[in-house]
Amino acid sequence: MTATEKTELAKAEVLIEALPYFQRYAGRTFVVKYGGHAMGDPKAAREFAEDIVLLKAVGINPVVVHGGGPQIGAMLKRLGVESTFVDGLRVTDKATAEVAEMVLSGAINKELVGWIAQAGGKAMGVSGKDGSLVTATKLERTTRDPESQIEQILDLGFVGEPTHVDTTILDTAVSAGMIPVVAPIGAGEDGHTYNINADTMAGAIAAALGAARLFLLTAVKGVLDKQGGLLTDLTPAQIAKLKDDGTISGGMIPKLDTCVHAVEAGCEAAVVLDGRVPHAMLLEFFTARGAGTLIRADD
């Protein structure tokens, strides 16, 4: 067998390995959170769009929820507006909220729609305000004063969290053969517009859709143990123990909280994986070895 023939055979074997997954999940929904950091790399954005179009081509219905923190920060800097963060969340006054909506819904969303179109797919860009997709309420956070131990309410401005997801607009888009691309903006019953953490938004949508998978693409290879090894499978109970003993800390905590909420509210499973790895999502789902950390509900 020639080298060329061996290469072609290897490609065929990859497809055969993936066949059971294609069959099992045809017609199911994958919700994918794509971070704003990755969008700054055209090659990575192109590969991500190709992965999404491939999922659609094999009968899976992807729904993309994107972030945009770096792009919002860059625009605020250009406009001379200073950014303030509390616990990793941007304090969002009225002016900042308007800039965030402009960047998320008007720039990033349409850029991602364009990448998918270039890869041969048909995408429809929306925000959580369109079709009353996501109703939000003001996010309330508290902090404890280290000296007095008195809890204080943090006012984050127009930062929200989802209270209700109406999937009608997503169902309509999917039925029409489209790939929904969602900006993390929601409308409050109070008439205000709220900026929502993209992980949280993706988790709420995955739960409402009863998605087969929620993928959170991050800048780490998954959930790591104290020795730096990858934890490939976790349940909510195991996650709680790892948080208590300090194995899970920092920015990974809210991501896993999102995963736990999603799998306990209707999503079949969630995956935290390294979005910097080319085609990481396909490696996780369509190969036996997988990639990243899979979270399933407790039995």
UniProtKB/Swiss-Prot annotation:
Looking up InterPro entries in the UniProt record yields: AceGlu_kinase-like_sf, AcgluKinase_fam, ArgB, Asp/Glu/Uridylate_kinase, Glu/AcGlu_kinase, NAGK-C
Where the protein is mainly located, per its record?
cytoplasm
Q: Name one GO molecular function term.
A: acetylglutamate kinase activity
- What does the UniProt entry say about where the protein is found? Cytoplasm
Listed binding positions for substrate are: 68-69, 90, 195
Catalytic activity, reaction form: N-acetyl-L-glutamate + ATP = N-acetyl-L-glutamyl 5-phosphate + ADP
Q: What is its EC number?
A: 2.7.2.8
| Alphabetical keyword list | Amino-acid biosynthesis, Arginine biosynthesis, ATP-binding, Cytoplasm, Kinase, Nucleotide-binding, Transferase
Provide GO CC annotations from the record. cytoplasm
- Record's NCBIfam families? argB
Stated family: Belongs to the acetylglutamate kinase family. ArgB subfamily.
- Which protein, by its recorded name, is this? Acetylglutamate kinase
Which gene is annotated as encoding this protein in its UniProt record?
Answer: argB
